[in-house]
Every structure is written in structure tokens, then in C-alpha cells.
């Protein structure tokens, strides 16, 4: 019987599996703890699925990493697990090992009272069949720096004595907290970042560290950019991986900052949430290439516990919900959700299994709960079945759509 357990010692094996899975074009470089065990690489918990429980079995069939995080959902912070580095060597593929690894991972999350699992998929179809589904869109805008000159024109009258751009280092990460908190309150699934995450995942990069510049107004950070400059002389791109602005003026200042690189770069690439109005404020939106892609995927770990911990609008409701979960037996069944005074109670029941008010899969329920998909959208796309329109109306009241954005990569 397969054994799921931590990988405390076989870090060279984890390194080999991960290198082959995600960067095969570079070969598999020899494991060097000084190079491959930097602080960024040691965050999270490594796990492996082994053929046996034998202690001398040093060759897992597949591996993964769990990041123990917290994310904001409907105004409250909930324990969230980032699932990453899922890798299987060719000789063990298509034997059901990853399915077992995912099932064991969810069981471990449940033991730790984790409410949501988030991952960045190599293929959406693959993880969708196991119950994860898209949590948000990611919008990438690309243009020549000159296209952003409108922002410089708009900010020319700003008080130079009260505004300044300042380059920050990892030791300055606390200066960004207030601006990031504004961002976190705006978007569902935004992470609660501790100092270690700021240092090693925001200020620290895989092969090189990004630049981090803050826009300060009256001695307070009103916005910031995390970016790299890629390419060779004459073909450089300023690539922004994180853009946070507390208000419209701060957004214009950040765009103007990018425009001011027109002597250094030929293109500017901005990665941002879908509601950041870059095309709306641009003077020449037709000169901006905009691409919308699916972001990470989210999954509820335990339906009954999660429904009981969420905050709801101040209303009363009683719904029977049938959930299909291909991976966990504790979620595959019927639940009664009772809401009163903004709090809910979700209990697993059997009496309503044949006559629920609502029927949907765990992936669709996850999207509904975090706010990415509305009940009406899920019904319209065949992802949710309801006995009548009142059930849809109740779900719409309990789970109104919200802006969601989980931009942290791992």
C-alpha cells in the first residue's frame, strides 16, 4: 500500500523530480544544498508518495510541496494551503500516483483545519477532474512605454515635495503593509503575508531578485511595483509582476514611473487584476495588447466546516445542497446550510440526498464560495442545478459575486 509522508532527507530526489518536471530544457543540475536550499527554497513542506512504508524506500513515486498560508475570503481570513511542485518522473506516470497524492494532501489539510487549497496548474483540465477550478483571471497589458505618457501628463502637477519614488529592499518590507492591506481588502483570496513571505517570495526571485519601488505620498506608501527588466539592449521589457495602487492617483503615478523607462526598455508588460482600469484610463487603448488568462485554481477542503465558518449577509436561509466530489468521501454527499444573523451552520445529512435544493460539483461550489462565479452564472453554464428560481435567489444572496485575485506564484 502506498505511503504518503514528509521528505525530510531526500531533498536531492525532490530537486531531481522538480527539475525534470518543470525545467527539463536545462537538464537536471547536480543537487547543491548551498545553491538549491536557499531560504526561498525551504519554505513550505515537502511530501512524497512512496510504494511502501519501508524507511529505506528513498524513491517516491511522486512529490509535492505544501505552503501553509492564510487568505481572505468574504471579509475573513481562512487557513489556505498552496499546493505546488507536483512532480512525477516518467517511469511512474499514468499509474494513479498523483490522484493518491492529491487525496492524501487534502486529508492532511483537513487535519490542519485548512479551508481552501490553491494551486497553479500545468493543465486546467487535469486538476478540474479532481475538484479544483479557476479562482480568478489574470490580465496582462503590454505596450511601448510612450503609450503610458498620458499618466506622466496627468501627474505633472503633483506636488514634488510630498510625493517620491523609493527603491525598497527586503528589510523595508513592512513599509508596504498598509498599501498591500488595501489590496487585500479589495480582493478575495489575497494572501496574508508574513515577513518570511515578503522577503523570500516577493523581494526574492528564482534566478534573480526583482526591483521593488514604492510610491510615497505624504510619507506613506500609496502604491508599489514589483518588476524585472528582461532581454538584451535594444529589446528590453519592463515586466511588472505586482502592481498595487491604493487609489486612482497612485495608479497614474505607477504608470508614469513605467513610462519614465522609455530610454531603457522597448516594451512594458503589466500583470494585474481584471478590474485595474488601465485600458479605461489610457489615451490610446488601441496601442495596448491585452491578454486575459485563467489564474490559479481553488478547492474547498471540507464543505461542512467551510460553510460553517464563512461570514454571510444578514439574512435567514435554509438550503439542502448536494455536492459531487471525485476525490474525498467527506465532501461527496448532501449538506444542509442554515444561515441566521450572518453566521452559517453546514451539516452533512443523508435525508435530502434524493431531493436537494441545489446540486453542483465541488469545483463549482468552490468558485461560488470565494466569489469568482455567481449562482446564476454557474446555472447558465450547466455547472449548477436548482429545483427552482428561489434556490438560485437564495444562493445569490448568500454568496454575492466579489472581485477575486490570487497573484502570488509558487
Model features per residue range: what roles?
Residues 114-115, 121-140, 275-291:
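Conserved active-site alpha-helix within GNAT-family acetyltransferase domains
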Residues 2-15, 164-410:
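Intrinsically disordered, low-complexity, positively biased terminal segments
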Residues 83-93, 239-248:
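A short, internal acetyl-CoA/4′-phosphopantetheine-binding micro-motif in the GNAT/acyltransferase core
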Residues 48, 55-69, 82, 87, ...:
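Conserved beta-strand in the GNAT
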Residues 92-101, 249-253:
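Conserved acetyl-CoA pyrophosphate-binding loop and the N-cap/start of the following alpha-helix
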Residues 1-62, 82, 150-197, 237:
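Short amphipathic alpha-helix that is part of the acyltransferase structural core
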Residues 71-82, 93, 112, 232-239:
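A conserved beta-turn-beta hairpin within the catalytic core of GNAT-like acetyltransferases
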Residues 102, 109-121, 263-273:
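Conserved GNAT acetyl-CoA-binding A-motif
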Amino acid at each position: 500500500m502506498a505511503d504518503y509522508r514528509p521528505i525530510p532527507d531526500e531533498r536531492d530526489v525532490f530537486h531531481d523530480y522538480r527539475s525534470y518536471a518543470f525545467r527539463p530544457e536545462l537538464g537536471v543540475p547536480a543537487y547543491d544544498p548551498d545553491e538549491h536550499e536557499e531560504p526561498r527554497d525551504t519554505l513550505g513542506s515537502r511530501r512524497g508518495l512512496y510504494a511502501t512504508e519501508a524507511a529505506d524506500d528513498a524513491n517516491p513515486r511522486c512529490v509535492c510541496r505544501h505552503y501553509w498560508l492564510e487568505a481572505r475570503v468574504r471579509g475573513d481570513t481562512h487557513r489556505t494551503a498552496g499546493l505546488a511542485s507536483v512532480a512525477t518522473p516518467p517511469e511512474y506516470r499514468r499509474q494513479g500516483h498523483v490522484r493518491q497524492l492529491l487525496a492524501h494532501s487534502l486529508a492532511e489539510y483537513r487535519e490542519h483545519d485548512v479551508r481552501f487549497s490553491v494551486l497553479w496548474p500545468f493543465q486546467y483540465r487535469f486538476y478540474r477532474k479532481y475538484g479544483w477550478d479557476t479562482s480568478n483571471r489574470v490580465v496582462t497589458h503590454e505596450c511601448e512605454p510612450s503609450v503610458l505618457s498620458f499618466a506622466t501628463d496627468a501627474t505633472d502637477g503633483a506636488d514634488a515635495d510630498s510625493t517620491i519614488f523609493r527603491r525598497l529592499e527586503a528589510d523595508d518590507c513592512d513599509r508596504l503593509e498598509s498599501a498591500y492591506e488595501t489590496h487585500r481588502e479589495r480582493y478575495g483570496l489575497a494572501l496574508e503575508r508574513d515577513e518570511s513571505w515578503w522577503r523570500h517570495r516577493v523581494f526574492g526571485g528564482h534566478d534573480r531578485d526583482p526591483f521593488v519601488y514604492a510610491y510615497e505620498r505624504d510619507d506613506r506608501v500609496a502604491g508599489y511595483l514589483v518588476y524585472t527588466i528582461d532581454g538584451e539592449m535594444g529589446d528590453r521589457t519592463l515586466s511588472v509582476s505586482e502592481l498595487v495602487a491604493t487609489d486612482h492617483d497612485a495608479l497614474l503615478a505607477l504608470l508614469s514611473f513605467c513610462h519614465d523607462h522609455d530610454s531603457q526598455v522597448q516594451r512594458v508588460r503589466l500583470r494585474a487584476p481584471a478590474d485595474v482600469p488601465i485600458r479605461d484610463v489610457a489615451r490610446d487603448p488601441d496601442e495596448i495588447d491585452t491578454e486575459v488568462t485563467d489564474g490559479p485554481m481553488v478547492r474547498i477542503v471540507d464543505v461542512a466546516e467551510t460553510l460553517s465558518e464563512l461570514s454571510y449577509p444578514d439574512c435567514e436561509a435554509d438550503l439542502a445542497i448536494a455536492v459531487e466530489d471525485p476525490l474525498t468521501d467527506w465532501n461527496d454527499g448532501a449538506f444542509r446550510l442554515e444561515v441566521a444573523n450572518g453566521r452559517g451552520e453546514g451539516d452533512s445529512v443523508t435525508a435530502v440526498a434524493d431531493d436537494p435544493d441545489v446540486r453542483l460539483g465541488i469545483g463549482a461550489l468552490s468558485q461560488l464560495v470565494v466569489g469568482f462565479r455567481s449562482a446564476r452564472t454557474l446555472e447558465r453554464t450547466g455547472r449548477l442545478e436548482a429545483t427552482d428560481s428561489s434556490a438560485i435567489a437564495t444562493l445569490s444572496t448568500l454568496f454575492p459575486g466579489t472581485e477575486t485575485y490570487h497573484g502570488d506564484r509558487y
